[in-house]
Amino acid sequence: MASVKFKLNNYLIVLFLLFFSQPMFAVTLKLRFYNAKTETGEKNLTVMVFETKKFFQTDGEGNVNIEFPNAGEYTLRLLRETGPTDIKISVSGDETRTVYTERKAPPKGGITVEGEREKTVAARTKVRYEEIKRMPGTFGEALRALETLPGVIPNIGFGGGANGIIVRGADPQSNTFLYDDLPILYAFHLDGLTSVIHNDLIKTIDLYSGAYPANFNNATGGVIEIETVDAVQKTKGAFQVSLWNTTAYAATPFANGKGYVAVGGKYGYLDRTLGQSGLLPDGIRLPRYNDSQVKFVYNFSQEHQIAFYNLTAQDNFAIAAPNNGANDPTKDELSTFAGGRFSVGLSFRTTALRHTWTPSEKFQNRLTLINYDPITENNISLGSIQGKQFTRALYVGLRQDATWTATSQIKVDFGTEYRKLSFNDYGTEIQLRDPTNPSPNPYNTTNPDFVSRPLSVRGTSGYYNGYTTIKAKFGNFAFEPGVRYDHLEITRNGALGPRATISYTFPEVLNGLTIFGNGGDMARFPQTTVFNRETGNPNLEFEKVRKTGGGFSLKFGQVYEVKIEAFKNQFRDTIVNDPFASVPIGLNPDKSQWLSNPLVSNRSLNYSNKGTGWSHGYEVLLRKNSKQGSRDWFGWVSYTWSQTFYNSNIYRVYDGDTFQYSAVERQVIAEYYNNSKEQLATWDRTHVANVIYGWRINEDYQLGGRWSYLTSVPYQRVIGDDGGQFSNPANGQTFWNARYSNNPYTAEFGNTKRGADYHRLDIRLDKFENYSWGYINWYLEIVNVYLRKNTNGESFDNSRPFSGTNPVPSQTFGTLELPNRTVIPFFNIGMEAHF
């Protein structure tokens, strides 16, 4: 402990010396010089601060960081070949600002709104739409570029399991995606390829992987903030057709420039293209989906603005394994599951009305009325598994967010929100009788591994939160402490989340060296009804994580940047399926028996907050930004080393434990005796690397490449089978159930096996045809160019017994096998028109 205190004291002393050795009141403005007549940034423009006689130069987009000794009035002299131009500005504190070098005369009654919120540098990675819209391997989806950022592990696969990302070791379901600060249920459609947001609506994407700001919530993983276009100068549109979907986009200003409307949408037909190719087994109907986004903005004046949003997405997927009556799995890939039925549906609608009031440059208040309607449906019929469930967790909320510039050094963000939750969950709920069973058998009729229970839950609850963040900047030193509190009324439980970010910038080191650190407590409560009093646990708490991290960012030249950051996350109170959690007396979960038997003893709560885990690692990002309007190359190299461990803390009966306990004794032991073992999380990947390259060859062609490398995920090895005790009653096919080690002292127990490493190369070639009305973009995208047979764990064929050839490595999506057995890379061909 003394050593820790000594190191901490030394660290504080170093920070103190660094802080007081630099100018206290220096101010840095992030400026973009923009020519409104040409609607382009002033690239490579030399700017002199007249008072200090210092020179600066903009990049290819007109961006530049300019330093001032203190707050005050300054003159910027723009040095052009046609002669100098002077622009006077008022400097009060560090901020981001747009400077118009030449203004286009606004239409009568037109209003120009400027400004952008300054964001933290710690644990945040920003990508611009221009850099990612044509990235290979993303199938034209800008959101898929998140997979290449440091700290992010892609969820390799195809289908619903591939529509999440792992951020610094967190469960892929624990992230929050926000569209202009509005919730969306899921970011990617069930095909695992396309996002629910149209590309042309995206302005920037920010990934907060560490201790995110207090205005965000409900994530123990990462927060992905999608900022959409905030201005439309002229009528424009886009139309794109590919092998599996069609997208459209249109935007136009109205009311003499006072407002604008932007609309985007997507329709998927993968089931009608790839699904009709004969490359898939009979009975599989690939995902169908659609989405739409509407944004309407109107400025009444410089002080008042209203915005209306409506976001929708709908997905469904189904499998109906044919019952051919043939007991030959070599001819029918789904014979083991013949007669089985499975379907899943996802949808959401987010409708919002937002009013922004800006009475002065020092204060802004935003009120948002939100109606959020997420729906999930599933229907399964397979052996002993018979269930159909519909879940809806709608809420109506009012949110307030304000920003107050108290002084030139102090800004305060604060806000509150109240939601009225209305949940509806009915049907038949399916759960594992033993959630620690790694290989449940759907045809086990002697002692079924699955349990079904009727579900009919309706109710309401209040939810409220409040937050505040103080942004203090004294010269090159920044400190942002914040705190947030969330409370769910139905569980009478809340979560307090303090957090802070600290940074210091050395502007004289190349083009700027910033050292930063961050830490804090974050919380999340799943959008489910696991807290209901009839079949769930009404005492569930928020899932929590404590995040800490630190590193540095170094800029050199106008376009290069290197960023290195280390982190550690500690997860606790994770909600898990718990067959031993119970109350002495509770309502009978079967409502049909309420008249005859309303109360039952030892009523199972089914869920608890016993899950724990932790992750640690470091990230490296080397980046070269693009130069708009130039043919220079751009790209980045990212690398992440990490480890993630998880423990459900659910009691297990191991091999060799033959002592006979009564049910009550077993329940008491399970409550107080934790004998589960911590092991690597199933989504852990030690090494993740990405190399991204883009080059605009000339006005007609652009070439892009992407190489990805990932360590294989850990998995538990199959050590045998159950002898084929059960069979599928639909066709008599014997079902060989895999068997895993249940002895924690053997090498085969737990997630100890890894397969071959994953890597692939993707390329994309774009051809542009320019016309007076716009342009057409033809593109060819090839995934897995060198036909790497990547695997993800192993696959056990239940139609055959355990042997040297069963199980085999599980192939991942990335190649196509033609009927003649020829293997080709997966590819996408499409056309996009912009007008």
Regions found by a protein language model. Give the residues of each.
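Transmembrane beta-barrel wall of Gram-negative outer-membrane proteins
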Residues: 244-267, 281-320, 342-367, 406-410
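Short strand-turn segments of transmembrane beta-barrel domains in outer membranes
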Residues: 193-195, 203-213, 222-252, 263-265, ...
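Short, acidic Ser/Thr/Gly-rich low-complexity loop/linker segments typical of extracellular
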Residues: 52-63
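Surface-exposed extracellular loop regions of Gram-negative outer-membrane beta-barrel proteins
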Residues: 323, 375, 427-436, 504-549, ...
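Gram-negative outer-membrane beta-barrel transporters
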Residues: 473-478, 602-717
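Periplasmic N-terminal accessory/gating domains of Gram-negative outer-membrane beta-barrel systems
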Residues: 93-95, 117-212, 223, 229
